[in-house]
């Protein structure tokens, strides 16, 4: 969905991306080189712009996109979509079918209530689930990028990143809306 009064929304529409959020991933990748050879997992893929970019950057691997909602992407080769909830065993089983992954990306956010305390708590739980799942499926030296809401227990998430990754960074890309309290945590080189 595009708000045409926004420069990133206009650019996304012009360039054929499904959402403006892609520019967050593009900026982070240009600074930190996330992609390498191997499979890529996109958790919370809807509406699909992260997957669009990841598919373009894919190097000798498969892109697996997961979401509870359908996404409007279909590629003939090296792409698999899983409609499911990452808290359910059946979905995790399907994700594991394609492991190991060299990169896990997630721009997922919980359904927001408008109550910042509730929203940050839900974001924390979702982020921790994504990290735990990533620890099971990442290739040694793999990378993880997760969106987190600030204002809760995000430092616990950051400490977990520090425990498992050689390089850890907190990032607020330029494309994040001014009034948003989202940031991204990047972990590079899993397994120290």
Swiss-Prot record:
Primary localisation category: cytoplasm
Alphabetical GO CC annotations of the entry are: cytoplasm
Keyword Methyltransferase, does the record have it? Answer: yes
Location(s) in or outside the cell: Cytoplasm
EC top class named in words: transferase
Origin superkingdom: Bacteria
Instruction: State where S-adenosyl-L-methionine binds.
Output: 48, 50, 67, 85, 107
Which InterPro entries does the UniProt record give?
Answer: RNA_methyltr_RlmE (IPR050082), RNA_MeTrfase_FtsJ_dom (IPR002877), rRNA-MeTfrase_E (IPR015507), SAM-dependent_MTases_sf (IPR029063)
Is S-adenosyl-L-methionine among this UniProt entry's keywords? yes
Q: Which UniProt keywords apply?
A: Cytoplasm, Methyltransferase, rRNA processing, S-adenosyl-L-methionine, Transferase
Q: Which SUPFAM superfamilies match?
A: S-adenosyl-L-methionine-dependent methyltransferases (SSF53335)
Q: Catalyzes what? A: uridine(2552) in 23S rRNA + S-adenosyl-L-methionine = 2'-O-methyluridine(2552) in 23S rRNA + S-adenosyl-L-homocysteine + H(+)
Location of the active site? 147 (proton acceptor)
Q: Which Gene3D superfamilies match?
A: Vaccinia Virus protein VP39 (3.40.50.150)
Q: Which EC numbers characterise this protein's activity in its record?
A: 2.1.1.166
| Gene Ontology molecular-function annotations | rRNA (uridine-2'-O-)-methyltransferase activity
Xref: HAMAP family: RNA_methyltr_E (MF_01547)
User: What exactly does this protein do?
Assistant: Specifically methylates the uridine in position 2552 of 23S rRNA at the 2'-O position of the ribose in the fully assembled 50S ribosomal subunit.
Which family does the record claim for this protein? Answer: Belongs to the class I-like SAM-binding methyltransferase superfamily. RNA methyltransferase RlmE family.
Return the protein name: Ribosomal RNA large subunit methyltransferase E
Q: Which organism is it from?
A: Borreliella burgdorferi (strain ZS7)
């Amino acid at each position: 969905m595009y708000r045409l009064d926004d420069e990133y929304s206009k650019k996304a529409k012009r360039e054929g991306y499904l959402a403006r959020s892609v520019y967050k991933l593009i900026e982070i990748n240009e600074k930190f080189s996330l992609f390498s050879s191997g499979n890529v997992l996109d958790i919370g893929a809807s509406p699909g712009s992260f997957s669009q970019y990841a598919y373009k950057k894919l190097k000798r691997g498969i892109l697996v996109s997961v979401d509870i909602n359908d996404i409007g992407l279909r590629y003939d080769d090296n792409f698999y979509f899983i409609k499911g909830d990452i808290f359910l065993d059946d979905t995790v089983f399907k994700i594991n079918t394609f492991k190991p992954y060299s990169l896990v990306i997630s721009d997922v956010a919980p359904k927001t209530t408008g109550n910042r305390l509730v929203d940050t708590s839900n974001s924390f739980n979702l982020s921790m689930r994504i990290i735990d799942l990533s620890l099971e499926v990442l290739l040694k030296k793999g990378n993880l990028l997760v969106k987190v809401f600030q204002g809760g227990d995000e430092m616990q998430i950051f400490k977990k990143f520090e425990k498992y990754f050689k390089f850890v960074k907190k990032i607020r890309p330029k494309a994040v809306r001014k009034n948003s309290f989202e940031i991204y945590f990047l972990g590079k080189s899993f397994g120290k």
